[in-house]
Amino acid sequence: MSVETIINRIREEAEAEIRTIRAEEACDVGAIRAQAEQKAENAYNHRIAEGQREIRQLIASQESRTRIEAKRKVREVREEMLRQCFDEVSSYLKTIRTRPEYPSFLEAMITESAKNLGPSDIAVKVHPDDRRLAADSISRINQEGFSLILSEEPIITSGGVICERISDRVVIDNTVEVRFVRLEREMIVAASRILFHGER
């Protein structure tokens, strides 16, 4: 074998080995590239999924805050309506003496007090403007077996009476102011039931 043949053979083997190395290198580069692309795609998909989850959480949080705010505003409006109702009742009670139904109301308050205090001497105290009405009512009520006396002691009230059993000084205050306070809780519950019906 000649030197030239040996050199050619070495050259061919070297070139074959270079081609093999380059082919392996190309495969490795392709695999590395494919692996890198897969990692990038996985990272992208993961980030998109995280972003969508964050968006859903933000939307849910905002919806929750909006619901809470809406309920708060509705509650405030209803509470304001309730306040207005009580203001109107209070205004009505301040002018009750001028109403056509007041004589019946005053007599009903005297009768209720007399029935609760029982058959004994009872002093009836009224506002000075109500003395004539009270005297007429007392006259009618005494015909039913009661012993009511119109007291000289005046009371300052928008309407109604204070009755006192003389024997033991037990007092029933049926003035509109005290009755309003007594009935206020009951009225709040009733009005709330109407205004807040169906609220959770």
UniProtKB/Swiss-Prot annotation:
GO terms for biological process: proton motive force-driven plasma membrane ATP synthesis. It comes from the Archaea. It is found in: Cell membrane. Its main location: membrane. Signal peptide: none annotated. InterPro entries: ATPase_E_C, ATPase_V1_Esu. Keywords: ATP synthesis, Cell membrane, Hydrogen ion transport, Ion transport, Membrane, Transport. Pfam families: vATP-synt_E. The keyword Transmembrane helix does not apply. GO terms for molecular function: ATP binding; proton-transporting ATP synthase activity, rotational mechanism; proton-transporting ATPase activity, rotational mechanism. It is a peripheral membrane protein. The keyword Cell membrane applies. Coiled coil: none annotated. GO terms for cellular component: plasma membrane; proton-transporting two-sector ATPase complex, catalytic domain. Component of the A-type ATP synthase that produces ATP from ADP in the presence of a proton gradient across the membrane. Belongs to the V-ATPase E subunit family. Has multiple subunits with at least A(3), B(3), C, D, E, F, H, I and proteolipid K(x). This is A-type ATP synthase subunit E 3.
